Swiss-Prot record:
Keyword Transcription regulation: no
Annotated positions of the Tryptophan amide modification: W11, W20, W32, W41, W53, W62, W74, W83, W95, W106, W115, W127, W137
The family this protein is said to belong to: Belongs to the LWamide neuropeptide family.
Protein name (record): LWamide neuropeptides
Compartment list: Secreted
Provenance organism: Actinia equina
Start and end residues of each stretch annotated as Disordered: 1-92
Amino acid sequence: RSADAQQHGLWGKRQNPGLWGRSADAQQHGLWGKRQNPGLWGRSAEPGQPGLWGKRQNPGLWGRSAEPLQPGLWGKRQNPGLWGRSADAQQPGLWGKRQDLDIGMWGKRQKAGLWGRSADPGQLGLWGKRRSRIGLWGRSYEPPQFEDLEDLKKKSAIPKPSEQ
């Protein structure tokens, strides 16, 4: 490190972006400063700076923005399909309202046939009203509300050897 923080050494203002060092002054444009290359795994010296952890964080990375409200991986712009959870339950993260139809097994639009459980028993998840119609091994919360109940029983019943 240079003797004076203002000198133009490796740790000074002219530090080559892309190196792994940290500038002597947080306001200098070192790797950890304002010009940090998006995509690196470092953290900017100040949370408000557009470093990897700041506002310009690349969606798809596993980091978390310094502030939950910033559109980092955990923020509002979280890419649907990732396994993260948005910082706010109301944000359209993986677990939120805009959950993708096929990807989210735990959301309201759960695709019938998956093994997940919907967030609300009244929702049409695998464990909900439509389960017995699917013919899976569970029991629906409510009795089957369709007329072909007897036909379903015949199809789901184990055939006796005498009937074969």
